[in-house]
Amino acid sequence: MWKNGAMRGCNKETGEFLGPSRSQQRRTALEVLVLSEKLAALTPAQLAKLPIPERLLPHITETKRITSHIARKRQLAFLAKQMRREDDTTLETIREKLDASGIQAQREVATLHRTEQWRKRLLEEGDSALTELLNQYPQADCGKLRQLLRNTKTEQARNKPPQAFRELYQVLHGLIITQNSDNQH
């Protein structure tokens, strides 16, 4: 019997099939298995941000604990079975939140890459890259950036610890994050 109370079969009056086909059931089961694998890969802090029912959390924790390949595969299948018992809206909500957090992580990585690219360009190209940066980020402090660039080049020439190099990264990262948050609002 299905969740909606109907049995698989054919309606004698209309000839329509009741309930999902076996292929559809398999596809749904595989989707839930993939979701269970994603949940098992998350940290406890990431799991806490998701709307996961309390009765699933021990199963997820147990899956994370198991390291043996076959035992882990079996536990993932059990977790997926427990998840299939949940209603579709709960699973869909978990999927949406998980996708949203994945998109946010991609944005953060892109911001880190953009920051690193700007730092590299500023050190290699000098004033032309600084002018372009100031055009793109008018709120930037030109004097501080020039000073950090000079100090970074001096550090590199003398093989000193990269203190100004790191500070330059932090300043650029702050600029990019400020610009991104201004654009989103």
Swiss-Prot record:
Q: Where is this region: Disordered?
A: 1-22
Major place of residence = cytoplasm
Q: Quote a single Gene Ontology cellular component term.
A: cytosol
Molecular-function annotations in GO? ribosome binding; rRNA binding
CDD domains listed in its UniProt record = YjgA-like
Does the keyword section mention Nucleotide-binding? no
Is Transferase one of the keywords UniProt gives this record?
A: no
UniProt xrefs under InterPro entries: DarP (IPR006839), DarP_sf (IPR023153)
Task: Give the domain of life.
Answer: Bacteria
Compartmental location: Cytoplasm
The UniProt keyword set, sorted, is:
Cytoplasm, Ribosome biogenesis, RNA-binding, rRNA-binding
Q: Which SUPFAM superfamilies match?
A: PSPTO4464-like
Swiss-Prot/TrEMBL GO biological process terms = assembly of large subunit precursor of preribosome
Q: What does this protein do?
A: Member of a network of 50S ribosomal subunit biogenesis factors which assembles along the 30S-50S interface, preventing incorrect 23S rRNA structures from forming. Promotes peptidyl transferase center (PTC) maturation.
**Its family?**
Belongs to the DarP family.
Official protein name in the record: Dual-action ribosomal maturation protein DarP
State the species of origin. Xylella fastidiosa (strain 9a5c)
